A protein has these predicted regions:
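N-terminal leader/capping segments at the start of a protein or of a new domain
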Residues: 1-56
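Short acidic-glycine-tyrosine-enriched beta hairpin
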Residues: 121-148
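A short hydrophobic beta-strand segment most commonly corresponding to one strand
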Residues: 106-108, 156-172
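A short glycine-rich, His/Asp/Glu-containing loop-to-beta-strand
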Residues: 62-92, 139
Length: 191
């Protein structure tokens, strides 16, 4: 069984449900979450809404877009019982721990490039199963189980992504991430 460490990343408690540029997106997300779909289908439906109405970096203030050189910063932009919206600010070189989620998620890149390494839980170890470069405009949706990954900004500019989680993250200390501390194996192709 995987050894899992629960941890919460730094989150600014910014609640602005009527933030300019977000109202239409919130309405579309709300409509999808009310359909009663299973988590995977909800994540994919919300990803479609995000793809169609992805805001630009100007959704955030100049100060919010700066981030922090010492740690990944997230800004909680909206929360309600069915979902929350966060903006993540990735300075060059910043990366997450290897983690998965306890709720569905959809995300889109609005600035820069985020490199994602995907893993499979094989009990006593994780196996790397793929790598993806998510560029501006790229959107993805996923739900547990099987969403183990690590995200890294390997570029030389700040990356910004918008994340929609199927949980209310407004309570202090709430996180949708589970971190993994297991040996990693890479699948090698046969020649």
């Amino acid at each position: 069984m995987a050894r899992v460490i629960l941890r919460c990343m730094n989150t600014s408690q910014l609640m602005t449900p009527a933030r300019p540029g977000l109202a239409d997106l919130l309405g579309g997300i709300r409509e999808q979450t009310r359909r009663g779909l299973d988590p995977r289908r909800t994540a994919l439906a919300v990803a479609d809404v995000l793809r169609a109405g992805m805001p630009g970096p100007d959704l955030l203030t100049d100060e919010e877009r700066r981030g922090d050189a010492d740690e990944l910063v997230s800004h909680l932009l909206h929360a309600e019982p069915a979902f929350s919206v966060k903006a993540l600010i990735w300075q060059p070189g910043q990366l997450t721990s290897i983690h998965d989620h306890i709720a569905w998620c959809a995300f889109g890149v609005i600035q820069g490039v985020e490199y994602e390494t995907l893993y499979r839980d094989d009990g006593d170890h994780l196996t790397e199963i793929g790598r993806v470069a998510n560029e501006v405009g790229d959107v993805s949706g996923f739900a547990p189980p099987g969403d183990i990954h690590r995200v890294h900004n390997t570029g030389d500019v700040t990356a910004i992504s918008l994340h929609v989680y199927g949980a209310d993250l407004s309570a202090d200390g709430i996180s949708v991430r589970r971190e993994y501390d297991l040996p990693i194996r890479t699948v090698r192709s046969k020649r």
